[in-house]
């Protein structure tokens, strides 16, 4: 996020807020995400970027004697139900560790272009790779370690751990 903010001239905290999303709430009546191959340009691009991250992380995990379990890409519009609860477009892209799925509202790409002046493939790929970073943190147990540390920490330290977690997901 920091590098992206420097590249685009945006406030890093504002970008963290948008990319990190908000809290999902459970709503059993929420629309379910469509399944199958994406048919629009943004969806096809997202699937291609995700496939590229799968290739890279599979190789990195293999070099460590482990196997990589890729997340599932879920494309949605307006709202979606996940194992982490229901999320609206306002949440932005998010990774749900409970179902190991990466949720992406394709309208978010338009928001990147219009609100943050970050149109194009780089910004879109960056967001997808960031969410995959959260998946890797979950697979390696880092997310659980950070959550445990946050529960023992004061508010300022817990927030600092959140920022570090977001920055690591960028890597």
Model-derived features with residue positions:
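A Zn2+-metalloprotease active-site environment signal
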Residues: 1-171
